[in-house]
């Protein structure tokens, strides 16, 4: 499969009058090419006890280790579904696992943030409450809010700096190799 740079992805699919294709498209077209291994699960949405959109598992049958990544996409920001909000931010004492990373594509940046750091920020800024209705989403977290917290951090990657993106994925790939 042909590899595409982030700036090309943004030009063809994000900076358009058409509807943005969404996170599953972003995973398939751009993110999968960044990993040295094929994920064990894509977009499991909580099925089989897996959290996140991209999941790598240990090949050792006696190990339950996994590395999971939640992916979000949105021009100005993004929100979380009812289940994601309730399980990951409100009922944090549950035995369900949490993602290891958040990868978020916004208008101007790609954010690759360790989940714990992102989760702490989201809870601090949005003070999420349990969503009781059948449908509903969390409050939106905006690009500018992420920038204010991570302005000088390596979590925020300028779209034009593909080499910085590679450095972040090298780190994640090393973690995947250790599974």
Where do the model's predicted regions map?
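Nucleic-acid endonuclease domains
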Residues: 1-179
């Amino acid at each position: 499969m042909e590899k595409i740079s982030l700036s090309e992805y943004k030009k063809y699919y994000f900076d358009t009058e058409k509807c943005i294709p969404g996170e599953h498209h972003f995973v398939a077209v751009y993110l999968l090419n960044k990993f040295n291994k094929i994920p064990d699960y894509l977009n499991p949405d909580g099925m089989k006890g897996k959290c996140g959109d991209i999941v790598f598992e240990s090949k050792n049958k006696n190990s339950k280790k996994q590395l999971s990544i939640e992916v979000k996409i949105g021009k100005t920001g993004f929100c979380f579904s009812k289940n994601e909000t309730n399980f990951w931010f409100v009922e944090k004492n549950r035995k369900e696992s949490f993602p290891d990373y958040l990868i978020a594509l916004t208008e101007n940046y790609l954010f690759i943030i360790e989940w714990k750091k992102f989760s702490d920020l989201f809870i601090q800024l949005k003070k999420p409450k349990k969503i009781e209705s059948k449908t509903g989403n969390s409050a939106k977290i905006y690009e500018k809010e992420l920038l204010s917290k991570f302005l000088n951090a390596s979590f925020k990657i300028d779209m034009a700096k593909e080499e910085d993106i590679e450095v972040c994925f090298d780190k994640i790939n090393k973690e995947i190799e250790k599974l």
